[in-house]
C-alpha cells in the first residue's frame, strides 16, 4: 500500500485498503513510504494503531513551551486491524520525513515491521504553520522521539536493510 502523504483522510483510506486486502487473503503487507514528506501526525498514529497492540508506545514528544515541559507519551489504543503475526515491510528513502518517520519508528521499535531502503530525512520536530505577511511561518512546537527513545532529528532512521536507490529510477521501475 503506497501512502503519498498523511492527510485527514489517509487513515480511513488505509484502513479500507487493509480490510479489503485481508478479505482477499493477504498474508503480509508492504507499506511504501518512499518520498512521503509527512503531514497529519494523527493520521500516522492512527495507522500505527492498526498494527501495534494496546498500551504500546508509539512516540514521545517534548513540547517547547515553558508551561508544558513534561514528556507526552502517545500509546496505541487497541484497534488492532492486522494480527501481530502478519509480516510488514516498510519502504523508505531520504524523502521519507516527519509523520512518515513517526510511523516508521513506531512500527520498527515495536517489532512490527522490517524497514527497507535508504536513510530517512530526519525531521524529528513538530511545527505549527501560520499565515504571516503574505507568506507562511513555521514555528517549532515540539521535538519527538521514537518508542525506543531515539532522537532522529537531522539524523533520520537507518533501515534494517539498506538499499541505495538511484534517483534516476522511476516509480514504474
Task: List where the protein language model places each region.
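Loop/turn elements at helix/coil->beta-strand transitions in domains of secreted/extracellular proteins
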Residues: 24-29, 54-58, 85-87, 111-114
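Solvent-exposed, polar/charged alpha-helical surfaces in well-ordered, non-transmembrane soluble domains
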Residues: 12-24, 42-49, 86, 101, ...
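Gly/Ser/Thr-rich loop/hinge elements
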Residues: 39-98, 124-131, 145
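Active-site-proximal beta-strand/loop segments in catalytic clefts of secreted hydrolases
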Residues: 2-6, 32-36, 61-64, 91-95, ...
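C-terminal, low-ordered peptide segments at domain boundaries
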Residues: 1-27, 49, 70-73, 77-78, ...
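Solvent-exposed, acidic/flexible segments
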Residues: 3-14, 33, 37-44, 81, ...
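Conserved P-loop NTPase
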Residues: 127-130, 137-170
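Terminal peptide-recognition signature
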Residues: 1, 31, 51, 88, ...
